[in-house]
Amino acid sequence: MKELIEYIAKSIVNKPEAVVVTEERSDDSLVLTLQVDPEDMGRVIGKQGRAAQAMRTLLRVMAVREGVRVDLKIV
């Protein structure tokens, strides 16, 4: 899941070298934190939050398969 978010984020930002995804796992949940350059924040969130929502939806689909709860934080 971490690799998917990293791939998507790097493909839409202007500074892909600034993309960092960290992962925190607990028993049945996973929190992914996506850090991007402040100039690229708008691109990652997207118009009316559509890009961020699409990434979260993809994560939920993958999480159902693995039986975990997932959350994406964009900072």
Residue ranges and their predicted role:
Residues 1-41, 47, 52-75:
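RNA-contacting regions in translation and RNA-metabolism proteins
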